[in-house]
Amino acid sequence: MSQSKDKKKFVGGGGGGGGNNSGGGGYGSPKHNNNNNNRNSSNNKSPHQSHHNQQHHQQQQQQQQQQQQQQQQPFDSLTAMKERTVFMSMSLVGQNVSVTLKNGDVYEGILHTTSTSTGSSGGGWGVALKMARKKDTNNRVITTLPLPLVIIEAKDFLQITATGVVLDHYRDSFMNRDQQSFITDTELSGFDGNLKERELTPWTPDPSVGESLDDFAANSEAKKPANWDQFETNEKLFGVRTTYEEEIYTTRLDRDSEFYKINQSVAEKKAQEIENEKSGNIHLLEERGFVEGADYDEEERYSSVVRKGLLPTSTTSTTTSPPTQNPTPSSSVYIPPSKRNNNNNTPSTPSVTSPPIVDKKHQQTHQDKKQTQQQQQQQQQQQQQQQQQQQQQQQQQQQQQTQPTTTATATASTSTSTTTTTNESPSSSSTSSTPSTPSTPKNITTTTATTSTNNTPTATNTNVNSPLGDRESPTISKLRLHQSTIDQDVMGSPRENLSPRSVAYTRYRQILSEPTNKSMNKSGSNISTTPVNGSGNVGPNGTPLLSSVHSDQAPKSPVPTIVSNHGLVKALSLELATPTVPEKFVNDFNNFKLKINNVDRGSETQGLKSFSSNLVIKSKSRPGSPLIGSGSPRPTPTQLSLSGSSTSTNTSTTSPPTTNTTTTTTTATNSTTPSTTEDDKSTTTPITTTILTENKSDDKEKEKEKEKEKVDEKEKEKEKEKSDEKDKDQSSTLVEKKDESSSSSNTTTTTTNTTNNNNNNTTTVTKLSKLKLNPNAKEFVPVVVNKPQPSFKSTTESNTDSVTPINEIYYDSMRKRQLQPESPDQVSLYWVDPFYPRYEEDPYAAAYQMRAHHHMVGHQPPPQLQFNPQFYSQQGHPQLQPHHHMVPPQLQQVPPGVNVHTMKPPGSLQPGGGGVVQPQGIVQPQGIVQPQGGVVQPSAGGAPKTMYQQQQQQQQQTGQPGGPMGVQRGGHLPPQQQPQQQQQQPPPQFIQGIPPGANLVISNGPPNQPFVFQGAHPPYAVPHPQYPMPPQGIQGGNKRFYQPPPQGYPQVQPMIIPQQGQVVSQNSPQQDSPSNRLNQQVPPYSYMTHPPRGYHPNENQYH
């Protein structure tokens, strides 16, 4: 008790005493004393050491506080009650219970499950009953069906009652014992220390119960006859006479023939010889009737282990000598009949002998052969015995030299006799091997020698490290592949059933179950439980003591001897041993996992996606539309079928370079043409057939075919002449067309002749067909010109051309592509989008839109602009592509080379506004021709409209505004170059000027050519014009009304405009960029057509 007082801790008090074992009102322990000393001594240590001690001390304090909190937690009564109710409910599952509710109702049923809940909100016990029924106290008879499931919640539950619960299986033998009696330690532990196996007793049937099938008959006195005929019985009982004949199901035997009689006599002789043989197999004896079932029990007859006979040995021998003793019926070694000694002093099994049926001559020669075989057998046995004795002596010498610790083997001492025999157990030799020779036949009588009691094998097991030593079986020794990889210490391994550990465990359990004695005599008559070098129980001479003489002494527990040996205790352990895995395997496995995790599965995922997409495409393809390419659904060779049935399968190739199949067709006629052949002279009728030919190897057949082809060609010519004169049916016309098409496609046509032996003209008509990709396709039938086309009906057959091969269709399409190739620099027409929205805000955007324009019916498109690629190269200027083909109207009078940015024109350019003063010193450029008679007239919408003489004349002639070209509004075309060089004055109302903020630099271009801007882009430099509202009567009021150009239309020839180059400003995109629409859509050396920029009434169709 003092020890517990010293360890007691008390936390409290506020006193400040400084003693070693004192505290503020509490006890102090030696542990605290040491802590205080360490805390005081920490001042003399280094800062690092003191810091380490403080951390360690803090960890100890945290652990102590956690333990105190766990000890100070109060006992929860609700938790304990919940545990008791859960245990009780689990014990009552499946019992018939009655549950009382708070309202007084009672439900009876089988308890299925319960739910217990505890908490601040309230706890309770819910019940679920199966096959429940509400209890009615008034009626004793049940009148209602049970409910399959009733759930009673905790708020309604009041009481549960279980009746008829059996608790006997929870009782133990100690509950029936008187509590006042004395109980020993062995009885308390329930184990007396002796491991005993249950003794097995054979099952014997009850003699009162009959096992015969005859006992089940209704009348036991009426026995079935020995020769019962089912046919005779059916005829008597039911009047049914059988028609059974054995010859229907088997081959008829001629029992009167000599062959049958000879074979029957030979078979009877062989059967008698086989039946008269003495066999050591109990199953054969039972089948032949030599052994009855009562002589042996089922364990001996049908068990896989034969427990009787000689001692089993476990030797890994390489040389075996044939046994000469007569094997017993329970022997586990199979011996052929030719190597058995039937005449033995000790009869093995009862046998029935009968003399064979042989002739005297045959019997005499048979006896002579047996005598010679007997002499040879004796000589061979003597030689074998001498060789075995020599081998045994050599083995003993080698074992004494190499393995002094192994047990010595004893050779069997045999008595002298005319014929000596070896041990039945096989002997082994590791140095030499001798072939085994057959022993004496069955009818030779020999005198056998008796062996001594010490009949043991001569082989020893060299593996001393095994847990069983010499007792180890050969199957276990084969498992020892390598000493480091053996899994004898691993329970639960794949080789657990055959591992040395499990074998040692079962062996030691068997040793403990047998009555043993500690002492071991020198003669080896008793068993000692003390192991020898951890190799089990072995005798002094190293032999396994499987059959030993037990002593009459009382059995004693071998536990002390087992506990003293660590190997035996380890073998008896039932715990799973942890396997030791080398570090190399662990690292390899971790590297493998890293490789698996780092694998890029993008390609695999993409492959799956492409596969699924291809699968969807294939599934949506129509059955009559073959797909060409790698993704086409090609059928397997087994799916290729013929739409027509052919009368012959023998085929030959008449045109090898073209195709391997030839279609042979002939027209059927009413007249018959006689033709004589060498094989058969008969009349032949030409019929319509289809034959698929193959290659034939015989030369004779080829010659015959050539002759037939010549005859067929002549017949074909005659038939054509007759077919021109007579009218034919629709089928004949179709065949002729097919013949013409086939002759044009280098296909050979032949006819087949069918012989008519019965003088009956029988014709078999088959359909024309070829191999096709779609087996479900319907044969194509061409439409007759003079007859109405058949209407398509909803049928399961498809209308697909199966006659024309798919290769011809593919080659025709490829041939057309080769004849009309597409240039690589030209964009296909289907890439041109004529309905692309135009730049409405840009008045000079006509040059950027290079797509074809769909003009209205009755309007003529503007003339195409010619292109001269050598013009600029001759003038010394780079070939550039202008942004617009005309100069803005405000800059037409500015000479080249003048900086427009320095000019400051007063006034504005608003319609109807003030004039613009032209700067002094500006000379108009040459080649700019002003329109004659131009007058600015206000339009209906208020916008200025310039009308010229030529335009007015065209309007008066055609009666349409804008002339026959219909370009009144828009038409940004340059003025026509006229041969006259005289400059005309502009009309008085035509005001010239420079727009403010133009900021353009005009290059020195050639005369009579449009200007090329090198500064900023015109749409950004020139201000956008202001468009007024459209005039009344025009649809699309929200559309802009474009201003007419201030210059006239071309009169004779359009102006030549270079279109090879392209003006690129400093801030414009590169020529190869995708945003450069001009470079992408306008190929070089091509013409451009510009649509009118005016408002069009059908503009909604194009925008």
From Swiss-Prot:
Q: Where is the composition biased (Low complexity)?
A: 33-44, 56-73, 312-356, 372-463, 530-544, 637-676, 683-694, 742-763, 930-957, 974-984, 1062-1076
- What this protein is called in its record is Ataxin-2 homolog
Bias (Polar residues) ranges: 516-529
A GO molecular-function annotation: mRNA binding
Disordered: where is this region?
A: 1-75, 305-474, 516-557, 615-763, 901-920, 930-1103
Biased composition regions of type Pro residues, renumbered to the chain: 1020-1031
Say yes or no: keyword Coiled coil present. yes
Biased composition annotated in UniProt, kind: Basic residues: 1-10
Q: Where is the Sm domain?
A: 84-166
